[in-house]
């Protein structure tokens, strides 16, 4: 058993739209490949489309989060709710247009072709049109 201190909070820019802060909470010790982060979104902020080869679990800690999939389905998750994104499912998540949201993001890294590991493959930004449709 060991007590750890979370890493420094980072402002996320390259694969997010709007203001998003991420605090890495923990990374499992080898052979574990689990990672946990607290992600905070300002109103209107969201991830780009992305996919987790091993899946992702989102546990909403504050506000209401939106989680959208390529088929147009949107889950509206409130504080205390948990959303499971299946392995390989392209999705995005973020805050509603008018309120803050925060969630714990839990993922597992997978082997990559170059011999490394990665928990995520980032894709293009979520269009404003797709994001607005998710507000309904």
Q: Each predicted region: which residue ranges?
A:
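Conserved short histidine dyad/triad with adjacent acidic residue
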Residues: 22-24, 35-52, 87
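Short, conserved beta-strand element in jelly-roll/cupin
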Residues: 38-42, 51-67, 106-109
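Short beta-strand His + acidic residue motifs that chelate non-heme Fe in jelly-roll/DSBH
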Residues: 47-49, 67-68, 85, 90-97
């Amino acid at each position: 058993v060991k007590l750890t201190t979370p890493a420094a909070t980072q402002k996320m820019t390259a694969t997010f739209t709007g203001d998003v802060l991420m605090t890495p909470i923990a990374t499992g010790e080898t052979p574990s490949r689990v990672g946990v982060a607290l992600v905070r979104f300002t109103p209107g902020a969201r991830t780009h489309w992305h996919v987790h080869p091993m899946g992702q679990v989102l546990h909403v800690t504050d506000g209401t989060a939106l989680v959208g999939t390529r088929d147009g389905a949107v889950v509206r998750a409130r504080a205390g709710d948990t959303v499971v994104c299946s392995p390989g499912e392209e999705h995005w998540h973020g805050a509603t247009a008018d309120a803050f949201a925060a969630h714990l993001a839990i993922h597992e890294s997978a082997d990559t072709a170059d011999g490394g590991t990665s928990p995520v493959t980032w894709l293009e930004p979520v269009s404003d049109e797709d994001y607005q449709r998710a507000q309904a």
